[in-house]
Design a protein with these regions (language model features):
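Catalytic core of DAGKc-family lipid kinases
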Residues: 5, 74-181, 185-189, 194, ...
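Residue-level recognition of short, well-ordered coil/turn positions
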Residues: 29, 54, 111-112, 229
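A structural detector for beta-sheet-dominated domains
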Residues: 37, 121, 143-145, 159, ...
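Short beta-strand scaffold positions
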Residues: 59-60, 82
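Polar, low-complexity loop segments and adjacent catalytic/binding residues used for recognizing
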Residues: 63
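ATP/nucleoside-binding phosphotransfer catalytic cores, i.e., glycine-rich phosphate-binding loops
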Residues: 186-256
């Protein structure tokens, strides 16, 4: 049975709320609907749904709700479904659904993909990617297991899934950086790789490194953004979950 955690604030109006419920009902995948609030946050509701014995926990909402529930779903036998509302384009791509209607269809056919998530500071998870918020080019240090990389950066992304970038290794994060001087003789320059087909490829070289863990330091604290909201601040550690989520995606999707 299905357990829907529905952030109704993401709906345009009451009519859309009813349209989503009606579509779910018409496909024969009705279940219990609950609405998160300050007293009962999404994380608690997800744990409650698992305790009640529901086989599928579904997040209906934006990136923040999805990430919060994803943290609960790690290593659980229940399937995790997503119906994105005001969510990032990347979330739509991960589940291979162009609209909430498509996402509901995904639930009907229940193609399960074992998926990992990114982890910040060993406690918070991110489903897609996060971004260091630079108000100006800033010197940063990125520490990997065997080496350090230092550069003056203007953009830096740490991604579990990044728009337009094929996921080469599900057990690693993709670290993508725009440096101020792309021709500088630094390790970033030596390791640089062009990421074709993404929205960030413009006039600068892109440095790309894949790793299962890293730490980012900066002379001053920098916000770490997830879908436009401050999620954490530097210094911060990043990793990829060893456990997986049983994510429902489109039947023809090849994402892993």
């Amino acid at each position: 049975m299905y357990y829907y955690i529905f952030d109704v604030r993401q709906c345009k109006n009451r009519r859309q709320i009813e349209a989503i419920k009606d579509r779910i009902s018409s496909l024969g995948i009705s279940g219990e609907f609950v609405i998160p609030d300050k007293i009962r946050p999404a994380r608690d509701l997800a744990e409650q749904g698992i305790f009640k014995g529901y086989s599928t926990i579904v997040a209906i909402g934006a990136d923040g709700l999805i990430d919060e529930i994803a943290a609960v779903m790690l290593a659980k036998q229940q399937a995790f479904g997503v119906i994105p509302l005001n969510a990032s384009e990347n979330v739509h791509k991960i589940i291979a659904a162009g609209s909430w209607e498509d996402a509901v269809e995904n639930l009907r056919y229940r193609r399960i993909t074992e998926s990992r998530v990114g982890i910040i500071n060993e406690q918070n998870v991110f489903f897609s990617y996060c971004q260091i918020d630079f108000d100006k080019p800033t010197s940063i240090t990125v520490e990997f297991e065997d080496y350090l990389l230092q550069a003056k950066a203007r953009e830096l992304y740490v991604a579990n899934r990044f728009p337009g970038l094929p996921k080469k290794d599900p057990s690693k994060l993709d670290i993508i950086m725009k440096s101020v001087d792309p021709k500088s003789d630094t390790l970033w320059g030596k390791l640089k790789s062009f990421v074709s087909g993404t929205h960030i490829v413009q006039d600068l070289d892109i440095s790309l490194v894949r790793s299962d863990g890293l730490r980012i330091f900066s002379p001053r604290q920098l916000p770490i953004l997830l879908d436009g909201r401050v999620f954490a601040k530097t210094p911060a550690t990043f990793g990829v979950s060893q456990k997986t989520i049983r994510l429902i995606t489109k039947r023809s999707s090849k994402s892993k």
